[in-house]
Curated annotation (Swiss-Prot):
Assigned GO CC terms: small ribosomal subunit
Subunit structure, as described in the record: Part of the 30S ribosomal subunit.
Superkingdom, natural source: Archaea
Descriptive protein name: Small ribosomal subunit protein uS7
Gene: rps7
GO BP term (any one): translation
Alphabetically ordered keywords of this record: Ribonucleoprotein, Ribosomal protein, RNA-binding, rRNA-binding
InterPro entries: Ribosomal_uS7, Ribosomal_uS7_arc, Ribosomal_uS7_CS, Ribosomal_uS7_dom, Ribosomal_uS7_dom_sf, Ribosomal_uS7_euk/arc
Molecular function (Gene Ontology), one example: structural constituent of ribosome
Recorded family membership: Belongs to the universal ribosomal protein uS7 family.
Secretion signal span: none
Lineage: Archaea, Methanobacteriati, Methanobacteriota, Stenosarchaea group, Methanomicrobia
A Pfam family it matches: Ribosomal_S7
Amino acid sequence: MYKLFGKWDLTEVEVADAGIKRYVNLDPVIVPHTSGKHARQQFNKSDITIVERLVNNVMRNAQNTGKKQIALRIVDEAFDIVNSKTKKNPVQVLVEAVSNAGPREEVVRLKYGGISVPKAVDTAPQRRVDHALRNISIGSNQTAFKSKRSAAECLASELIAASNRDAKCFSINRKDGKERVAKAAR
């Protein structure tokens, strides 16, 4: 059986949120690197493991653009830190963080006679996963910028805080803000 980075077993990870279960891929791989095979089809990003999608989002930062080996190392070190702090499988912590950090409602603008009116709509499950991963990586990048803490430490603390639904966490804060605006627009 393959273990992620030679350490973490993906078969013991369970997705509790039924809405995103189809979009969180937990196929066993050693190194999460598919070389962009999903890029030709619109919704094929769901076929990539959730860890590689996190790696790709970490790689989006300005100084890390295109440096997948650096992003893989950051995620690997962050998973080690998560395991040492929580004594849980870090992929399980990642899945819990994604399910907690994905917004369930957002706002669209509708035009009625030249006037734009905000309307609350449910968020698609794949979009929930995308926003959660993006906000987790943005939060860790902002925390690590001009800080003595490493990017791996910041990513680990963001994952742990998001899995615990900590309101101080960037991704949970961003999710709550979106849902608050949507609630006002009902």
